[in-house]
Design a protein with these regions (language model features):
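Non-catalytic DNA-recognition/assembly elements of restriction-modification systems
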Residues: 104-191, 280-323
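Basic, amphipathic alpha-helical recognition segments used for DNA target recognition
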Residues: 4-11, 27-28, 37, 44-50, ...
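Structural motif
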Residues: 31, 209-210
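A generic structural signal for residues embedded in beta-strands
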Residues: 33-34, 188
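Sequence-specific dsDNA recognition surfaces
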Residues: 1-28, 159-207, 225, 231-233
Length: 323
């Protein structure tokens, strides 16, 4: 549940199961609200359905007074934020009594609700269009890579230590992380620093580095030369000794090949497995051309993503304007 319309679920219930249980039918269009773990997450029932005990259906007794979509917008925009007050803490859950007695729903006239819904739908349309554009641009990146392999390529095995330097970091204890540290520490998430420290594990940062997460969600990042970083034992790093290879291009292909291998939290991207990977690469000139084109596309994606980050607050502003 993530603000979407639900029409299909992983699990289904039979007619016999309905008769033996106390589940109640929830009508299409009803706002769905998560009760447990991911408290406050919302969705809309895309058709008549039943839910388990972790999901509440906010069924309306008087649809002449309240619009279903207005109710959804209140919760989905976090205008009514159930995550506040510690109710999203592990082991805690909401219940119907709390919703009935503690959650206050602002109820403007129906024509105001309609204005709110209409203005938020404009933002939702903008949001959807930008998400689709991001998808198109990501497909363009894939196409650029695929096209780069149409000519002459050479296969490089990452175990070739005459070309590649590959290693993993060292375990850090929490008390080694410093509030005033300057050097970012990377763990399984190679995009967001785990913390900061004031000592180095590696001594040479004169070459670009490619980082990958060993036992988290599969991800690969690229760091320019002269940027210090500290890898933990959940982070692998790769450096290239051959000037005929472009580090960014290698990073892109490593990410692609890692997906083929199915690296994940359970299928660890250990050094042995990484070294078994072969990467097909075109000439250095083509590598640089492709990287330059991809960087332009990535800049467009970043602009769109930044725009998307502003939309939730814009939805809140619509609600604040009328309420």
């Amino acid at each position: 549940m993530n603000g979407n319309i639900i029409t299909e679920t992983k699990e289904n219930i039979t007619d016999a199961g309905v008769k033996k249980s106390n589940v109640k039918l929830i009508n299409a269009g009803t706002t769905l609200l998560s009760f447990k773990l991911s408290i406050g997450k919302t969705a809309i029932a895309g058709k008549n359905l039943y839910t388990n005990e972790a999901i509440a259906g906010l069924c309306l007794e008087n649809e002449e007074k309240v619009l279903n979509k207005y109710l959804f917008d209140l919760f989905n925009s976090k205008f009514i934020d159930l995550e506040k007050g510690g109710f999203n803490a592990f082991g805690k859950s909401l219940n119907s009594e709390f919703l009935r007695n503690e959650v206050k729903i602002p109820l403007p006239p129906k024509n105001i609700q309609e204005k709110i819904v209409s203005e938020i739908e404009v933002l939702e349309k903008e949001e959807q269009e930008k998400k689709e554009k991001v998808g198109v641009l990501k497909s363009e990146i894939v196409e650029l890579f695929e096209n780069s392999l149409n000519g002459d390529v050479k296969n490089y095995r990452l175990s070739d230590d005459s070309i590649f330097e590959i290693g993993i970091g060292k375990r850090l204890l929490k008390d080694e992380i410093l509030s005033n540290g300057k050097i970012p520490v990377y763990s399984a998430n190679v995009f967001e620093p785990f913390g900061f420290i004031n000592k180095n594990l590696l001594n040479d940062f004169s070459r670009d580095s490619v980082l990958w997460g060993i036992d988290g969600d599969w991800m690969v990042n690229y760091l320019s030369k002269n940027i210090d970083f500290y890898p933990t034992d959940h982070c692998g790093y790769l450096r290239i000794k051959d000037n005929q290879l472009n580090e960014k291009f290698v990073a892109y292909f490593l990410e692609k090949e890692g997906k083929k291998f199915g690296f994940s939290r359970t299928n660890r991207a250990s050094i042995d497995r990484i070294q078994n990977i072969k990467i097909p690469l075109p000439s250095l000139e083509i590598q640089k051309q492709i990287v330059s084109q991809i960087e332009k596309v990535e800049n467009e994606i970043e602009i769109l993503k930044n725009d998307l980050k502003t939309i939730p607050e814009k939805k809140k502003e619509v609600l604040k304007k009328y309420l």
